[in-house]
Amino acid sequence: MIITIFGPPGSGKGTQSSLLIAKYNLKLISVGDLLRNIISSSSELGKKIKGTVESGNLIQDEIICGLLRDQLALVDDNCLLDGFPRNLNQAHFLTQVLQEKYNRDVDIVVELQLDDNIAIDRLKNRLACLDCKSIYSVSSFKSTTCAKCKSTRLEKRIDDADMSAINKRISEYHLQMKGLREYYKGKLLTIDANLSVDEVTQEIESKISCNLV
């Protein structure tokens, strides 16, 4: 089974992806994690990507698609793609690569739909563990240690630090989603991400179960 999950910044893609790969025994390919790892390497590519991310712009398709192709070469056809595709061009690329490698396409597409004001509030308060990628809200999480892996490396993401960049990312997401919804019509499961984590998980699993019947 090949699942892709996307949604606006702050919609909980990483959290839901972690739960889904455990339930359905899938390999995870997270575009966001790949980019953050490259940025932390301080390579020339990392510096270039960091500047793009901090400004709220999208990374060039050439870079993203190259990273994805490399990752797909390492997994079988039971995987979950977190945060890819991000536009119609990337969707066409994904179909081509999956057809070449597995002679198939994506089975299920999950879109997490989130109100803009809630997305902004979550991003302003988001705290991430640099080691295990767990996400917390600074308004409710007062510890200096990650509850999951006990790491003390808790920081705000660089792309959450600037309000204008946040607004730009959200606007760009809505702009790109119009084409993606049409492209994946018939495979698209829309989920209300304004709900609690558990409620979102239940809705996703329920719709996936119905889709697999």
Swiss-Prot record:
It is found in: Cytoplasm. Its EC number is 2.7.4.3. Pfam families: ADK (PF00406). Its main location: cytoplasm. Zn(2+) binds at residues 129, 132, 146, 149. Residues 125-160 are annotated as: LID. Pathway: Purine metabolism; AMP biosynthesis via salvage pathway; AMP from ADP: step 1/1. It is an enzyme of class 2 (transferase). Keywords: ATP-binding, Cytoplasm, Kinase, Metal-binding, Nucleotide biosynthesis, Nucleotide-binding, Transferase, Zinc. It catalyses: AMP + ATP = 2 ADP. AMP binds at residues 36, 57-59, 83-86, 90, 157, 169. Belongs to the adenylate kinase family. HAMAP family: Adenylate_kinase_Adk. Consists of three domains, a large central CORE domain and two small peripheral domains, NMPbind and LID, which undergo movements during catalysis. The LID domain closes over the site of phosphoryl transfer upon ATP binding. Assembling and dissambling the active center during each catalytic cycle provides an effective means to prevent ATP hydrolysis. Some bacteria have evolved a zinc-coordinating structure that stabilizes the LID domain. Monomer. This is Adenylate kinase. It comes from Wolbachia sp. subsp. Drosophila simulans (strain wRi). The gene is adk.
